[in-house]
Curated annotation (Swiss-Prot):
Entry GO terms, CC: late endosome membrane; nuclear envelope
InterPro entries attached to this UniProt entry: Snf7_fam
Motif (MIT-interacting motif): 208-218
Gene3D superfamilies on file: 6.10.140.1230
Subcellular location per the Swiss-Prot or TrEMBL entry: Late endosome membrane; Cytoplasm
Membrane topology value: Peripheral membrane protein
UniProt keyword Protein transport, yes or no: yes
PANTHER family: CHARGED MULTIVESICULAR BODY PROTEIN (PTHR10476)
Record GO biological process: exit from mitosis; nuclear membrane reassembly; protein transport; vacuolar transport
Family: Belongs to the SNF7 family.
Protein name: Charged multivesicular body protein 2a
Origin species: Xenopus tropicalis (Western clawed frog)
Recorded name of the encoding gene: chmp2a
Source organism superkingdom: Eukaryota
């Protein structure tokens, strides 16, 4: 059928064809307008020539031709402007048609995605995922408890002893630093010779020094 009657043109092809016809018409009008403008210049020159020769009747006739020619030039300018406006409208239609085709493609793609994304199946997958995650968490917790029961007691006891020793060492250093700054009346305390890890001895020396200072105050 296309071979007999010809292929049916698409809207975009028809728009391009009309656009080419309008551009051709504008070029032809430009050529005609230029011819009229050249003729206008020639009439003006002839009017000046006849006026110098005193042939006023001829001047009046050519003046009418000049007015008529200028009107034609103006009409060609107006017609070209109208054709250009139509050409711009056709260009706008082409742009809108291109936009419509793009939106049509996007719509088809969205419809395809909506058909593929079946909500019940996705919900089922998510529920199964949550179920398997909970099972995995439970198994991991059971394995950790079993490992802690098998290995955790001795390690915890050793770690606790290490923490206690560290705290006592730090407390002893702090008390030693404070005692070294206290003033003494009966002689200086031997703080420099204190050993780390003996906070009880440092506390006893501090109590004795404080008691001695209180006795001195009572005597005064």
């Amino acid at each position: 059928m296309e071979f007999l009657f010809g292929r049916r043109k698409t809207p975009e092809e028809m728009l391009r064809q009309n656009q080419r016809a309008l551009n051709k018409a504008m070029r032809e009008m430009d050529r005609e307008r230029q011819k009229l403008e050249q003729q206008e210049k020639k009439i003006i020159a002839d009017i000046k020539k006849m006026a110098k020769q005193g042939q006023m009747d001829a001047v009046k006739i050519m003046a009418k031709d000049l007015v008529r020619t200028r009107r034609y030039v103006k009409k060609f300018i107006m017609m070209r402007a109208n054709i250009q406006a139509v050409s711009l409208k056709i260009q706008t239609l082409k742009s809108n048609n291109s936009m419509a085709q793009a939106m049509k493609g996007v719509t088809k793609a969205m419809a395809t995605m909506n058909r593929q994304l079946k909500l019940p199946q996705i919900q089922k997958i998510m529920m199964e995922f949550e179920k398997q995650s909970e099972i995995m968490d439970m198994k991991e917790e059971m394995m950790n408890d079993a490992i802690d029961d098998a290995m955790g007691d001795e390690d915890d006891e050793e770690e606790s002893d290490a923490v206690v020793s560290q705290v006592l060492d730090e407390l002893g250093l702090t008390l030693t630093d404070e005692l070294s700054n206290l003033p003494s009346t009966g002689g200086s305390l031997s703080v420099a010779g204190a050993k780390k890890g003996e906070p009880s001895a440092a506390l006893a020396d501090a109590d004795a020094d404080l008691e001695e200072r209180l006795n001195n105050l009572r005597r005064d």
